[in-house]
Structures are given as structure tokens and as C-alpha cells.
Curated annotation (Swiss-Prot):
Component of the MRN complex, which plays a central role in double-strand break (DSB) repair, DNA recombination, maintenance of telomere integrity and meiosis. The MRN complex is involved in the repair of DNA double-strand breaks (DSBs) via homologous recombination (HR), an error-free mechanism which primarily occurs during S and G2 phases. The complex (1) mediates the end resection of damaged DNA, which generates proper single-stranded DNA, a key initial steps in HR, and is (2) required for the recruitment of other repair factors and efficient activation of ATM and ATR upon DNA damage. ATP binds at residues 13, 36-37, 39-42, 64, 66, 68, 159. It comes from Chaetomium thermophilum (strain DSM 1495 / CBS 144.50 / IMI 039719). Its cofactor is Zn(2+). This is DNA repair protein RAD50.
């Protein structure tokens, strides 16, 4: 393990240029403490510069990294950073880096990097490894065992760059690509790709050369055949032979024409079947479309134009609606302003009239409220008269009761939340298991589909190979027979002893020349009979070969045909039986296709309905939340509360305000009557000197009269009326605010009852969609299996046709053999009978001449036969070699198909196991959810009960506080207002509000109409498109019916059978002509000069053609194999990169989750993770390339969101620290070093403590491994206390400024912090 030991800093930033400062790094913890600006971060900058050679941000120019020369009064300052470290194998190194800052005459500063060094210390010996800067950067990274990207972004991350995990996507991708060293592996793949492309170009050249060499090889073979043919030609029979050849060519052309005509009729038959299937499909599509569309009478062109213009129409309607909505909002603002003015005027109208009466009424109301509240909340001792002291005591007691209820509710909510969290965790665990099973199931399904595609490709390649075991056996049988014929021909040539016989006959010929003519005629006749017998032998041989070929074919494909047709199948009925089975399989494939298409259509409809339901649910949820916020805002404004009350209290609050307003208005009416009454008392006392109530005389009782007048004067004041009017205005304003949102409250209540039912519908549609997906997957599987079987049967179809053709050929050959036997059995006169009519001499002459001719011809024939058989043997050997190669390739393909089928079965078993696991998990999840709902309802009931008690007490306290404050305010208010001006203003405002409301109602009607048109647009658009599709299908159906009728009228089957029969007849005639030509060619002699010319040409140009072709063919095949190997190698590297990346990301995210959950103290984020999204790009020359896009996301429950732009500054700091710790854990296997610079920035006290405890746990866990070097740089000594640093180190380093304001490093005891 590598580690750093000491760091020396000289002339860097605030460190002086004359005396170096040194710091030693300990294991497992090194602490660096200092106030802001003391130079702590410079330590990290120097470590990073020493290891990577990179300067801090914004310090690459103008010498910002070097000590300012002006501070020391010098023109030049040299900075030096030395780092002592040990490599991964324990070697001791010292890296030194030097940098210079020079101030020139024009005060321009020049920064220059000087030569550094890497020193190896080994047993007292000091060896300089390198002094070049570029080599230093590479060597230090290698010796530490850490890539430069990890040193830069993880281990020695600068404070300015510490939040890089929260940077924008492009910068984040660049960081992670450097960390994963993606460019190295990308370059490897690119090199392999270029090499593969180069080999592909070479393959093209080799294939062209192969074609040329093959042509030369075929040309050489052709020359061989021509040379063999020339040896058998006879000049006397050339014209006749040419005539026969011409006749044969004419017959071949006729046969070819017949087969081509038959194939054209066969194509018509296939077209008829294809069009019939398409017609059935079109009919089904027409019925399905007709069931769901509303037919439109407009022409197609009008519908297409309407469809094209639909988007413009909708945009125009939306713009019109938005314009009217803007007008509505403007009117609404004007109406709100008018209402506010009206409310203010109405409040001012009655305020001064109700002050005094309200004051007295509120005194009575307060006593009544206290008695009622005491009785309601069981507070004893408040049934009698109440004075101010007892009222104050009551307020204190009820406030204490309210505080107790609040604490009780908080405790209950905390306990309930803990219970719900435990049950939610159970559900989350099972849901996680379910998602894992679903992912496994999807992977297995994808594997099945992939294997199916591979099998289809392999099956297509297999179908292209016409060679089978039967063909090989047939070729080997031909070779064996040909070898026997060669040996027999050679034996006949040796055993004949023809030279001696010819010599003996030549001695007799001169004696018997007179008898040669008659003997020659007899020989011609005998030769004709011999020809007939030879033709009979040829036909018997052909018949035997075709029977043997039929036997080989039936034995080879017996297993496949037995599987399809049963064990008792016969070649005679094979074509009809196989055609029936093939048609049944085609019908089965069609049925599976129809079912799959129907289910797919049903799935599309289900997805459309589910999407609509979800959109509606989201829309209604947003509307409900908006209504709830509006109602809560109005309640908060009406009561002037700090926080919004529950929306369910709206009706209670509205009824309370209405009741209070009625009471205030009643008090105002009573106030006027009381004022009249007190005016009468005052008038009587002044006029008649008597009390109006008791009729007491005030003569000689001036004191009593004065007291009465003073009391009446107080009653006649306007203060109480003023308070009543203010109360009236306040209640009216509150009621206006609450009544303005009554519609939204009703909407909220309605949506609260509708949304659960809509959620259940969404769940039902979701389950239906999942059922349809599973059904469609099963139907896809059944369709692929049936289609694969159909392809296998179609592959066998050519063998069926070949067996059928062999049966017909055998039948025709048997008939020809029978006719030849009849011709050869015709009786002719024998040689003895001829000799009886001739003289003995003539007969002997003819016999000798015939014998000489026969011996000569036999000698030449045997030579030609041996040569011809040798040529045929070479050709047959090449055919056998090619057949063996193709059979081996075919065997490899069949084995590959078998492996793919086995893999498919394993994947199907995995899908079945996943389905069983899902069926088991669904009831468990449902049970857990039911338990959670039941617990939630029970908890909610308990909380509601305590909350109701708290709210009742809170309402009492609120009402008492309100009435007490109003009573106190009455003592400070006074002064009437003018009513007339207020009434005129109110009338004008009411007229204005009525006009505005009318305009708003008209705009609302128009906007609703436009919204309805927009909502119905999608359905209309889809209906128009379906109408066009429906009409197109009708036209195509009519066209197909006409085409089918035309094809059926052509009677293609009868013409096909007739043409095949005529072709067989022509083949028989051609066979006869061929037999005649072969007989004549056997009599031809070889032209020696032509033979020599061909032989010279062969020796000069074509002698090595076969070897050259073989060499080129080997190069082509080896190059193909190399290209395939390069492709597999490239795929293997790509797969290894994917696996490595997935493994590392999983390890990093696991570490991040553990650190976050043990550190973060908030409840808004459960965990964070790094997401790497794979993006594949395809190009024509480089294939598919993968890129990774990274982002940091936060998770709460089942919700995942991007963290960038959504989290606080403290969460950014904490997340960045945790991500760096996780990256160091994963990528620093050879170096347990990491530095944290001011890790507590922007963190609150709870998270600071938690981070300290987590770091303590990490150090403790890694301490035993001996490879951890954690460097913590901070100004927060409380944070170090929480870390309990004394467990890991005895001292720390303090960075501070000396008297010259230079930074110095001082070593101090850890007890300075912990005490």
C-alpha cells in the first residue's frame, strides 16, 4: 500500500520564501486546524501539485500560486514543494517541484515551471529517477498506484471544486469518464474496430482473387474435359455428332422452357394462396375498424385536408382560449379591487355606529364564553360572577391545558409515525423483491427473444445448405462404383491381350479380303443390336441409381417425416400428406398471428385508457390541491394566522363569522334604542329635576343628580358604537374572503370523494394492462414456436419435392426399360444363317475383318474408358470434399440451434419461476398494504380525537383572545364617520361589480366552450384517421378479390401438371439422343495435334490453378475467421467494460447509501445515488458505441429526482463529501489516502455531528487494515470534538500567521481540542 509521509512548503501563497514549513502525515488520521485565511487550503493545493503537477483553479497565470514578491521586496520568488511518500511496493520516494515568479521592469509578472526531480531512497542510496516534468506526472501517479483523475477529483479535491458532483451534466460526464479511464478502453475497442475494417478490406480483395482463381480452376477442369473429349472424337462421325448435339440442345431449351412455364404457374398458385390470406386479414381489419369508428360522409381528400389542418385549428382555438382567459384574469383583478374597496367602505360604514354596544355585548359575551368554556372543558369555580382577576386566572389555566394537549398530540403523532414506518418498510422490502423478480423476468423474456432471432438467422443459413448426409452417401456410393468400374476397365485391358490377337488377325486378312463387304454388313447389323443392348443397360443403370437415391433420401429424412406424418408414411403419398400438414401449420401460424394482433390492439386501447385515466387523475389532483390552497389561504387571511389551518375547519369558521356578524348587527340596533332611552333620562333630570326611572326628586340631592348625569353621559358616548362598527366591518371582510372561496371548497369536497374511485379505476386498468402484456408475451412465444416449426417444414419441402420427382423419374425409367426390352427381343437372323447363304471364304473374310475391327475398337475403347473414368473420379472427389465441408458446417449450425433451444427452455423456466414468485408476492404485498391502511386509519382516529380536543380548546382560547383584544381596542378607538359619502361609494362599487361579474360570466361560457372543443379534438382526429384507414382497407379488399378471381380463372394447377408431364417426355427423348451421341463419340479417334495444343495450354497457364485456388480459398476462410474473432474480441472487451462499470457503480452506490443513511439527519431524503444512463450511438463505419451520462439523484420513498438544482447548500456539501468517500473506497485499493477541506461548510449542527460520527466509524473500521490516511482540514474545533480524534492521534497541526503575516505550521497536542 502506498502512503505519503512528509510535505515541505516554501514560497507558496502565504508561506514565506525563506524558511520551509513541514508537516508529517500520520496513519490513520492527520488534523490540520486554523482560522479562515491562515493557509490551510494551501496544504491541499501543494499535495495536489506535488502528485499531479496541476496548479489550483485560477492560478495558472500571473503567479497567484507563488508568494507575492512585493511582500518580501524582491523581484524574484522561487516556490518549492517537496513530498516524501512510499510506493505500493514500499519503496521510498521524494518528489520535488519548483516554480518561479519573476517581476520584470514594466511590472509584468512571468510565471515559469522549473525542472523538478523524483528521488529514490534505497538503503541509504539516493537515485534520481527523472527530472522531466511530464515524466514526473506519470511516474508519481504510477508509484502511488492511483490514476491522476482520482488524485485530482477525489483524494486532493480543491475546495473550489469540491462540489463537482453537483455540476452540470457535461462537466459531470467528463469527470466520471476520467475517473473510469473510459478513453483507454474506448481506444482499444476503436483499434480493434479499425483492424476489423482493415481485414474486411483485405477480405474483399481476397474474394475477388478467389473468384478469378476459381474461374481459372474451372477453366482447367474444362480443358481437361475437352482433352478427354477430343480423344474420343472421330472425323467420319463429326457432322452426325454435331447434329445430335444440336438436337439435344434444342430439346434442353424446350425442357428449360417447360420448367420455366411450370414455375410461372407455380408462382401464380403461391400468389393465389398469399392473396387469399391477405384478403382474410383485411376483412378482419375492416370489421374491427367498423366497430369503433363513426363513418363520415366527406370524401377522402376533404378528410385528409381536415386531418392536416387539424393541428392549426387546435392551435388557433387554444390561442383564442388563452386570450379570453387573460381577459378573464384582468376582469377578475378589477373585480377583486372593487370588492376590496366595497369591503373597506362597508366596514367603515358601520364601524362607528357599533363601538359602544359591541363593547358592552362583548363583556357579557366574554363572561358567557368563560362559563360555557369552563363547563365544556370541566374547569370548576366559574359559575358565579367574574371579575378581571378571575378572568385572567381562567385565561392562564386554559392556555396551560391547550399546551398540554398539543404536547400529547405531538407524542401520539410521533408514535403513530414510527408504527407506520415499520409497516411501510415491510411493504417496501416486498415491493423491492417484486421489482427484482420483474426485472429478472424481463431479462429472461429478452433472452428468449434474442435467442429466437439468433435461431431464425441460423435456420436461414442452414436452409441455404442443400447438401445432406444422403447426398454424401450417394456421392460416396458413386465413387465406390466408379472405382470398381476403373479397376474393371484396367483388368479388362490387361486380360484382353488384344495386341497378339490383332497381329494374328492381320495375318489372315490378306487371304480373306474378298469376303469383307458381306462380313462388314453383318458387323453393322450386329453393332446396331449391340447399341440397343447398351442403351438398355444404361437405362437399367439409371433406374437403379434413382432407386438407390430414393432409398437414401427416405432413410435420411425418415425421422423428420415420421415426426410430422407418423411412422407409416409412404413416398407415394408423401407430397399430398406433407402438403396437408404444411397447410395446417400455415393455418395455425395465421391463427396465432391473428390472436397476437388482436391482443396487441387490445393492449394499445388499454394503454390509451390508462393514460387518459392517469392524466385525468393528475389534473383533478392538481385542481383539488389548488382549491385546498386557495381555501387555506382565504382562512389564513380571514383570521390573520401565521400558518394555514386545516381545510376541514372552513365551514365552522364561516358559520362562526356569520353568527358573530348577526350578533354585532343586533347590538347596533339595540345601541340606538338605548341611546334614545338615556337621552330621555338626561332630559327629564335637567328639565324636571327628577329621575325618569324611579321618579325620585333631586331637590337637595345634587350629588345623586350629578352621579346620574355622569353615568348617562358615559352611556351617550359614541365609543361603543364605533367599536361595534369596526367589529361589523371586520366580520364582513372576513365573510367576504371566506364566501369568495366557497365554490373552491365545494370543488375540493367533490374531488376528495371522486379521486379514490378514479385511483381504483387506474389500479384496475394497470392490472388489466399487465394481464394483457403477459398474455401477449405468451402469444408471441406460441407464434414464434409455430413459425419456427413452419420454417423447418418449409425447409423439408424441397426434400419432399425431390423425393416426389425421384418417384416420377423411377416410373418413367421403368417404362423406358420395358420398351427397350421389347425392342431388343426382336428376332434377327444369326451369323450362322448368314454364313449358310455365303461362301465359306466370304464368311471367313467377313469374320476376320470384323474381328480385326472389333479388336482395334475395343483396344481404343478400353483406353478411352480408363482415361474418362479417371477424370470423373477426380471430379467426384472434389464434390465429396465440398459436401463434407458443407455437412460439417451444417452440423455446427444444428448444434448451435440445439444449444439455443436449450437456452430458451432455461429462460422459459426462469420466466415461469418469476411468474410463480410474483403470484406469491402479490397476496403478501396486498396483506401488508391492508395492514398499513388499517394501522393508518387507527392512528388517524387517535390523532383526530386528540386533535379535536386540542382544536376545541384552541378555538376557545382563540375566541377569548380575540374578544379580549377587541375589548381592549375599544378603549383606544373613537370618532364617527360620514355615512352618506360611504353609501354613495358603496352603490357605485356595487354597480361596477355587477357589470364586471356579467362580463366574467360571459367570458367563462366562451372559455368552457373552447375547452370542450379542445378536449374533443383527439377523438375527432382519431376518428378521421380511422375513417381513412377503413376506406383504404375496403379498396384493398376489393382489389384483392379481383386479383384472386383473375388468378383462379387461370387454372394454374392444371397447366402446371401438363407442363411437368411434357417436360418429362422431352427429357426421355433427350436421354435417347444422348445415348446415340455417346455411342458415336466412343467411335471417334483423338486428334493428336489438338490434344497437344490443349496440353501445352494446360501446362503453361492452368497447371497450378487448383493449388492457387485452394491457397486463396484458405486465405479467405482464415481471414473470415480472423474477422469473426476480432468481432468476438471487441464484444468481449465491451462486455467486460460494461460488467466492470456496473460492478463499480453498484459498489459506489452501496457505499454512498450506507454513508448517507448513517450521516444525514433530515427526513426529506432517504438516500442518494449516482445514476449512469447508457446511450448507444450507431454509425456506418464504427458500429455501435456506448456512452454513459451521469447524474446524482435523491430518493424519497418510491420517488427519485435529480439532486442538482433541488437541494440545499448543506445537502450539496454533504453529498459531495459522501460521493468522494465512496469513490475513494472503490478506486483507491492501493492507496487509502483522502483529504477533506472544510467538510462542515453549510452544514447544520445535527449534520455536522452526524458527519463527525460517521468519519469516526470509517476510521475505526479501516484502522485495523493499516491503509487509511485521512487528512481533515477545518476551522471548526467542535467538529473535531465530535469526531473523538483522541482515539486515533495524539497531536494535530495548527496553521496560523506569524508576525510577518507568513503562514506557519505548528504541532500541538490533541488535548488542546478535546478538553
Amino acid at each position: 500500500m502506498s502512503k505519503i509521509e512528509k510535505l515541505s512548503i516554501l514560497g507558496v501563497r502565504s508561506f514565506g520564501p525563506h524558511h520551509p514549513e513541514t508537516i508529517a502525515f500520520n496513519t490513520p488520521l492527520t488534523l490540520i486546524v486554523g482560522y479562515n485565511g491562515s493557509g490551510k487550503t494551501t496544504v491541499i493545493e501543494c499535495l495536489k501539485y506535488a502528485t499531479t503537477g496541476e496548479l489550483p483553479p485560477n492560478s495558472t497565470r500571473n503567479g497567484a500560486f507563488i508568494h507575492d514578491p512585493d511582500l518580501v521586496g524582491e523581484k524574484e520568488v522561487r516556490a518549492q514543494v517537496k513530498l516524501s511518500f512510499r510506493s505500493t511496493i514500499g519503496e521510498s520516494y521524494v518528489v520535488t517541484r519548483n516554480i518561479q515568479l519573476l517581476v520584470q521592469r514594466n511590472n509584468k509578472r512571468t510565471q515559469k515551471t522549473l525542472e523538478g526531480s523524483l528521488l529514490l531512497r534505497n538503503n541509504g542510496e539516493r537515485t534520481v529517477i527523472s527530472t522531466r516534468v511530464a515524466e514526473l506526472d506519470k511516474l508519481v501517479s504510477e508509484k502511488l498506484g492511483v490514476p491522476p483523475a482520482i488524485l485530482d477529483a477525489v483524494i486532493f479535491c480543491h475546495q473550489d471544486d469540491s462540489l463537482w458532483p453537483m455540476s452540470e451534466p457535461a462537466a459531470l460526464k467528463k469527470r466520471f469518464d476520467e475517473i473510469f479511464e473510459a478513453q483507454k478502453y474506448t481506444k482499444v475497442i476503436e483499434n480493434i474496430r479499425l483492424l476489423k475494417k482493415k481485414k474486411g478490406d483485405e477480405l474483399k480483395i481476397l474474394k475477388e482473387r478467389e473468384v478469378q482463381d476459381k474461374a481459372n480452376k474451372e477453366r482447367a477442369e474444362k480443358v481437361d474435359r475437352l482433352m478427354a473429349q477430343l480423344t474420343r472424337e472421330i472425323l467420319e462421325a463429326r457432322e452426325k455428332c454435331n447434329e445430335l448435339s444440336k438436337q439435344m440442345e434444342e430439346e434442353s431449351a424446350k425442357i428449360k422452357d417447360k420448367y420455366e412455364q411450370a414455375n410461372s404457374f407455380l408462382k401464380i398458385m403461391n400468389d393465389l394462396q398469399t392473396k387469399t390470406e391477405k384478403l382474410e386479414y383485411k376483412k378482419d381489419a375492416i370489421v374491427e375498424l367498423r366497430s369503433r369508428i363513426e363513418e363520415l360522409p366527406d370524401p377522402d381528400e376533404v378528410l385528409r385536408n381536415t386531418l392536416d389542418e387539424y393541428e392549426q385549428t387546435i392551435n388557433r382555438i387554444v390561442a383564442d382560449r388563452d386570450h379570453k382567459a387573460a381577459q378573464f384574469h384582468d376582469l377578475q383583478a378589477e373585480l377583486k379591487s372593487a370588492r376590496d374597496q366595497h369591503t373597506a367602505k362597508a366596514a367603515e360604514q358601520g364601524k362607528h355606529q357599533s363601538d359602544k354596544e359591541k363593547y358592552e355585548r362583548q363583556l357579557v359575551a366574554r363572561e358567557r364564553m368563560i362559563r360555557e368554556a369552563a363547563e365544556r372543558h370541566e374547569i370548576r369555580g366559574y359559575n358565579g360572577d367574574l371579575d378581571d382577576r378571575r378572568i385572567a386566572i381562567f385565561n392562564e389555566r386554559i392556555q396551560k391545558i391547550l399546551n398540554d394537549k398539543r404536547r400529547e398530540l405531538e407524542r401520539l403523532q410521533r408514535e403513530n409515525q414510527e408504527e407506520l414506518d415499520r409497516k411501510t418498510a415491510v411493504i417496501a422490502e416486498r415491493e423491492s423483491r417484486k421489482q427484482s423478480v420483474i426485472r429478472d423476468r424481463k431479462a429472461a423474456k429478452d433472452r428468449i427473444i434474442s435467442l429466437g432471432k439468433d435461431m431464425a438467422s441460423i435456420q436461414g443459413e442452414l436452409s441455404s445448405i442443400d447438401i445432406d448426409e444422403g447426398t454424401e452417401e450417394m456421392l460416396r456410393a458413386e465413387m465406390k462404383e466408379l472405382q470398381a468400374r476403373i479397376e474393371a476397365a484396367k483388368a479388362d485391358e490387361q486380360n484382353a491381350n488384344l495386341d497378339a490377337q490383332i497381329k494374328e488377325v492381320n495375318e489372315e486378312i490378306w487371304k480373306l479380303e474378298s469376303l469383307s463387304a458381306k462380313l462388314a454388313r453383318e458387323l453393322v447389323e450386329c453393332t446396331r443390336l449391340a447399341s440397343e443392348r447398351a442403351q438398355l443397360d444404361l437405362r437399367r443403370k439409371q433406374l437403379a441409381e434413382r432407386k438407390r437415391e430414393l432409398e437414401i433420401m427416405t432413410n435420411t429424412w425418415n425421422e423428420q417425416f415420421s415426426t410430422l406424418l407418423g411412422e407409416g408414411w409412404r413416398p407415394e403419398t408423401l407430397e399430398r400428406d406433407f402438403s396437408d400438414v404444411l397447410k395446417q401449420q400455415q393455418l395455425l401460424v395465421g391463427e396465432h398471428r391473428k390472436k397476437k394482433d388482436a391482443t396487441q390492439q387490445e393492449l394499445k386501447q388499454a394503454e390509451y385508457q390508462l393514460s387518459n385515466a392517469r392524466n385525468l387523475h393528475n389534473k383533478l389532483t392538481n385542481e383539488m390541491e389548488a382549491c385546498m390552497r386557495a381555501v387555506q389561504t382565504a382562512m389564513k387571511e380571514a383570521r390573520d394566522l401565521d400558518s394555514a389551518p386545516p381545510v376541514d375547519e372552513y365551514i365552522t369558521m364561516l358559520e362562526t363569522d356569520e353568527k358573530e356578524l348577526a350578533e354585532v348587527e343586533t347590538a347596533l340596533k339595540l345601541y340606538d334604542e338605548l341611546k334614545k332611552h338615556y337621552s330621555t333620562i338626561k332630559d327629564r333630570a335637567l328639565r324636571f329635576n327628577k329621575c325618569y326611572i324611579c321618579d325620585r326628586d333631586f331637590t337637595n340631592q345634587e350629588a345623586a343628580k350629578t352621579r346620574l348625569l355622569e353615568k348617562v353621559a358615559k352611556r351617550l358616548g359614541d365609543e361603543e358604537k364605533k367599536e361595534l362598527l369596526e367589529d361589523q366591518a371586520a366580520f364582513m371582510k372576513s365573510l367576504d374572503i371566506l364566501r369568495a372561496v366557497r365554490v373552491k371548497y365545494d370543488t375540493y369536497q367533490r374531488l376528495s370523494s371522486e379521486l379514490p374511485q378514479l385511483s381504483r379505476e387506474i389500479d384496475s386498468e394497470t392490472n388489466r394492462r399487465e394481464d394483457l402484456v403477459r398474455r401477449l408475451e405468451d402469444q408471441d412465444l406460441a407464434f414464434r414456436e409455430a413459425d419456427n416449426k413452419l420454417q423447418e417444414m418449409e425447409t423439408l419441402n424441397k426434400h419432399v419435392m425431390k423425393i416426389t420427382q425421384l418417384l416420377k423419374d423411377i416410373s418413367d425409367a421403368e417404362k423406358q426399360v420395358e420398351r427397350s426390352q421389347q425392342l431388343s427381343n426382336i428376332e434377327t437372323r444369326s451369323a450362322d444363317e448368314i454364313n449358310e447363304e455365303q461362301t465359306t471364304c466370304a464368311e471367313q473374310t467377313r469374320a476376320a475383318q470384323a474381328k480385326l475391327t472389333k479388336l482395334t475398337a475395343e483396344k481404343q475403347r478400353l483406353k478411352d474408358l480408363v482415361r474418362q473414368l479417371e477424370v470423373e473420379r477426380l471430379q467426384l472427389e472434389n464434390k465429396i470434399s465440398s459436401a463434407v465441408q458443407q455437412l460439417e458446417r451444417k452440423k455446427r449450425l444444428q448444434e448451435s440451434i440445439a444449444r439455443h433451444k436449450e437456452d430458451q427452455n432455461q429462460a422459459r423456466n426462469a420466466v415461469q419461476e418469476a411468474d410463480e414468485e410474483l403470484e406469491r408476492l402479490e397476496p403478501e404485498i396486498a396483506g401488508a398494504r391492508a395492514a398499513l391502511d388499517e394501522a393508518r386509519q387507527a392512528c388517524r382516529a387517535k390523532e383526530q380525537k386528540v386533535a379535536a380536543e386540542r382544536d376545541a380548546i384552541a378555538q376557545t382560547v382563540s375566541e377569548l383572545n380575540m374578544i379580549n383584544s377587541e375589548i381592549q381596542e375599544y378603549l383606544d378607538r373613537g370618532g364617527p364617520s360620514s355615512l352618506a359619502a360611504n353609501q354613495r361609494a358603496i352603490a357605485n362599487l356595487e354597480t361596477q361589480m355587477a357589470n364586471l361579474e356579467g362580463e366574467m360570466r360571459e367570458l367563462t361560457v366562451q372559455i368552457n366552450k373552447l375547452n370542450k372543443e379542445i378536449d374533443n379534438s383527439d377523438a375527432k382526429k382519431r376518428n378521421i384517421a380511422d375513417n381513412l384507414t377503413y376506406r383504404k382497407n375496403l379498396r384493398e379488399k376489393d382489389a384483392l378479390e379481383r386479383e384472386i378471381a383473375e388468378l383462379e380463372a387461370r387454372n394454374a394447377q392444371e397447366d402446371y401438371d401438363r407442363l411437368i408431364k411434357e417436360a418429362h417426355y422431352l427429357e426421355a427423348h433427350r436421354s435417347k439422343l444422348n445415348a446415340d451421341r455417346e455411342r458415336l463419340m466412343g467411335m471417334m479417334s483423338t486428334k493428336d495435334e489438338e490434344f497437344r495444343r490443349l496440353n501445352e495450354e494446360y501446362e503453361l497457364d492452368l497447371k497450378d490453378a487448383k493449388a492457387k485456388y485452394k491457397e486463396t480459398h484458405i486465405k479467405v476462410e482464415t481471414t473470415k475467421a480472423a474477422i469473426e474473432d476480432l468481432g468476438r474480441g471487441m464484444a468481449a472487451v465491451d462486455h467486460a467494460i460494461m460488467q466492470y462499470h456496473s460492478k463499480m457503480m453498484e459498489q459506489i452506490n452501496r457505499t454512498i447509501a450506507e454513508l448517507w443513511q448513517s450521516t444525514y439527519q433530515g427526513t426529506d431524503i432517504d438516500t442518494i445515488q449516482i445514476r449512469s444512463d447508457v446511450e448507444s450511438t450507431t454509425s456506418s463505419d464504427s458500429g455501435t458505441r456506448r456512452n454513459y451520462n451521469y447524474r446524482v439523484s435523491m430518493v424519497k420513498g418510491d420517488t427519485e429526482m435529480d439532486m442538482r438544482g433541488r437541494c440545499s447548500a448543506g445537502q450539496k456539501v454533504l453529498a459531495s463529501i459522501i460521493i468522494r468517500l465512496a469513490l475513494a473506497e472503490s478506486f483507491c485499493a492501493n492507496c487509502g489516502l483522502i483529504a477533506l477541506d472544510e467538510p462542515t461548510t453549510n452544514l447544520d449542527s445535527d449534520n455536522i455531528r452526524s458527519l463527525a460520527e460517521s468519519l469516526h466509524g470509517i476510521i475505526k473500521a479501516r484502522q485495523a487494515q493499516g491503509n487509511l490516511q485521512l487528512i481533515v482540514i477545518t476551522h471548526d474545533e467542535e467538529f473535531l470534538k465530535y469526531m473523538q480524534c483522541s482515539d486515533f492521534c495524539d497531536d494535530f497541526y495548527r496553521v496560523k500567521r506569524d508576525e510577518k503575516q507568513n503562514s506557519v505550521i505548528v504541532r500541538e497536542s490533541i488535548t488542546r481540542i478535546t478538553e
